[in-house]
């Protein structure tokens, strides 16, 4: 009898910083889609952030590892750092598929990504290699293009937390408590991240 395909959720992003909405999205996908694991993939050089200040890969990786600590079914992959250059999903997925041939990949995205899909590199090719899965985000357009009609929607809570807002709160001296794992909050404070941008 052939071995069942492993079901892996992929959650890519800048994670600057990782926050509770990322973790809730991942856990919801794990439970609702009956996935084996969630692999978090921090972008090495995010192409959509060119010209913006982004924390070092080392800081973002450290925060992500702290954020998922304690959940054995959450893993962090550094594949985009190993690949080098700009981090394009269309280039990362074939590498993962070669390394893990008996795996069904689910690409996890917030509905806020729908507005940006046209700027992705070869988006239709991306979603031919992985099942698109969308999580609801507050105040975002949720109309799918026809080539994405096979997408799955999660029934996740709509948490209004964004990394942009978290960085602004830190810069303004406001609390980020309960919006981010405590370990990540302590790391941000210890390293003095986001005080100036």
Model region roles, listed by residue range:
Residues 1-197:
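Nucleotidyltransferase catalytic core that binds NTPs
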